[in-house]
Amino acid sequence: MEKLLLITPPFVQVNCPYPATAYLKGYLTRQGYQAEQYDLSIELINRLFSRDILLRIFDACTPEQMGKDPHLERMYGLRERYLSTIDTVMEFLRKGDNTLATLICNGEFLPQAGRFDAAGELDYFFGNLGTADCAKFLCTLYLQDLSDLIRGTVTEHFEIVRYGERISMSIPLFAKLEAELRQSRNPIEEEMVALLERQIEAVRPTLVGFTAPFPGNLLAILRCAQYLKERHPDIRIAMGGGYPSTELRTMTDKAIFRYIDYIILDDGE
């Protein structure tokens, strides 16, 4: 019997679960299929915004990179504060602990780089009763600063809620995407395929299905598919969702099928 693994790829909105693969898993299970669901998007975000990975990113920064951008140079000077606060910030965003919210709203706790410069007067916006919302806002600025660091030193394709969107919009031709796929995987993509490999080993699927709701998912899907073709050539790969059913359906270049076995349009035809 087929064993399916349904994956939400990097990156979708991180402040609420994206339900497509969970709904599809439930439907397939009721139909008697063996199916599992995995949110690779949130797992990779949790991995990237951790002390371990952040330390690696800072250690890999070069003087040339820092010298080109005062914003990044400012962040590098605050590296120890970022390393000492990142796990607390992520714990708060996952659990919403009010004690942590109060700590975060203390103006001395979070390191502040360029994104904070335009934050405005927080008391005016949140008052005394909006501590949790204020903390979420500050954490968002903090993570946006770190995203700028990743984009400036690791890969230009990174954003918290999308990956490689600009290059993925270059349809109907596949050449730009394939040129990117010929490049070595960057550190973010290495973390992504490491997480994928763990799930493949745990589930042992015969078919992996990716949902692609947005253009900012396509490059990550193709990187995962490329890895699966290299390491697990017997696994078949399918892709569906909002993006293939709309803009991507105009693609005429069949080279995409070197990576994806099936592209599912609309409701599955």
Each model region followed by its residue ranges:
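Conserved phosphoryl-transfer catalytic core
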Residues: 47-106
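A short, charged/proline- and glycine-enriched loop
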Residues: 1-4, 203-204
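Glycine-rich beta-alpha loop elements in corrinoid/cobalamin-binding modules
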Residues: 11-14, 18-51, 90-120, 125-130, ...
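Generic preference for hydrophobic/aromatic residues in regular secondary structure cores
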Residues: 86, 143-146
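Nucleotide-activated donor-dependent transferases that construct or modify glycoconjugates
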Residues: 3-13
